C-alpha cells in the first residue's frame, strides 16, 4: 500500500519478489504493475528484457495542446449543432472541442469547453488553463503492440496497464487494469 509519487525510483526484479528502490529505502512486493505510458517504463525499468523493450516500443505518443476555456468560437456557429464531441478541420487547424456541460452534466450557467489539437487563437480572458498532454498515437504498430502485450504480462512478476492498450479513453485504462487484476488473481 505504499504510494510513491515524484520520486527517484529504480526497480529490481527477482524470481520471487520485486523491489522498488527509493533512494536508500527498498520496498518489497509480490508483483509490479506499470500503470503509465509504455514510453515511461524504460525510465523506471533498467533490467527490461529485449522482448519487453520491443513490444513497449510499438506504442508511440504525441503531444497535444489542451485548452480549458469558455470561448464558444471553437464550437459550431449554431448552438443547435453542438454535441459532446465536436471535430473541426478548418484551413490549417485540426482540433476537437468537448462541450463539458453536456458531456459531464455540469451545473453551470457558463458553457465550459476542453479543446485539444491545433486550434486557432482564442481570447485569453476566456481561458482557464493551458495544458500539454501526451496522448497515444494510434497506428498499425499500436494494434500490434496491443496484441503482443499479453505475451509479457506477468513475466518477471511485471504487468502493464493503460489506456493505450485499447482506444485511449480513461475507461480503457480502467478496463486494462481490471484485466491485469484478473491475471494476477488467476
Language-model-derived ranges and their functions:
Residues 10-136:
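Mid-domain catalytic core of redox enzymes
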Residues 6-7, 23, 161:
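Conserved beta-strand termini and adjacent loop/short-helix elements that scaffold enzyme active sites
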Residues 1, 29-30, 155:
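Short, well-ordered alpha-helix to beta-strand connector turns
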Residues 93-186:
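Conserved flavin/dinucleotide-binding core of flavoenzymes
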Residues 1-9:
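A conserved beta-strand/loop element that lines the FAD pocket in flavoprotein oxidoreductases
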Amino acid at each position: 500500500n505504499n504510494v510513491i509519487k515524484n520520486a527517484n525510483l529504480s526497480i529490481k526484479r527477482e524470481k520471487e519478489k520485486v523491489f522498488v528502490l527509493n533512494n536508500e529505502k527498498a520496498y518489497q512486493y509480490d508483483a509490479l504493475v506499470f500503470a503509465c505510458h509504455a514510453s515511461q517504463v524504460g525510465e523506471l525499468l533498467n533490467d527490461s528484457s529485449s522482448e519487453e523493450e520491443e513490444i513497449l516500443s510499438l506504442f508511440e505518443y504525441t503531444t497535444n495542446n489542451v485548452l480549458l476555456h469558455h470561448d464558444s468560437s471553437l464550437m459550431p456557429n449554431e448552438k443547435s449543432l453542438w454535441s459532446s464531441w465536436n471535430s473541426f478541420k478548418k484551413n490549417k487547424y485540426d482540433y476537437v472541442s468537448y462541450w463539458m456541460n453536456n458531456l459531464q452534466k455540469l451545473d453551470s450557467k457558463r458553457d465550459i469547453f476542453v479543446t485539444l489539437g491545433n486550434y486557432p487563437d482564442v481570447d485569453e480572458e476566456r481561458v482557464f488553463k493551458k495544458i500539454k498532454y501526451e496522448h497515444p498515437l494510434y497506428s498499425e504498430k499500436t494494434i500490434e503492440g496491443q496484441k503482443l502485450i499479453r505475451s509479457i504480462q506477468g513475466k518477471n512478476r511485471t504487468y502493464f496497464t493503460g489506456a493505450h492498450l485499447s482506444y485511449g479513453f480513461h475507461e480503457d485504462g480502467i478496463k486494462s487494469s481490471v484485466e491485469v487484476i484478473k491475471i494476477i488473481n488467476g
